[in-house]
């Protein structure tokens, strides 16, 4: 294989795997957000409130990107028996992303008003619910890969192997 062919294959594989690559960053950031927010609620003077804002914003941007890439990557499976299983995963993913977008908007408004809600129990509850939705998204996404072989090379259901 020439380096041009290898590069072309690498680019094609990366585009095909984009969703799988993108999902792990927002998962890590938003789960960490839940832990740090709990710490801030328990220790209000910890100085970590700004850290939770950064985790929320970057994690939410990543979640939106991962959700969009997931919607795009599911199109080849529209007419397959796996469509229902994929829709279940999509529902959890869209719900988690929507909740974190709403939390980001809520917190942004509260910060502009000079009273950051990021250290409140109510904000922690919202983040905890979002983390639960994110966990369900991850579990159903894992099922797609490990139980159904979605996007696993050599076992791709679209190829009949």
What function would you assign to each model-found segment?
Residues 1-161:
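Polytopic transmembrane helical bundles with strong interfacial aromatic enrichment
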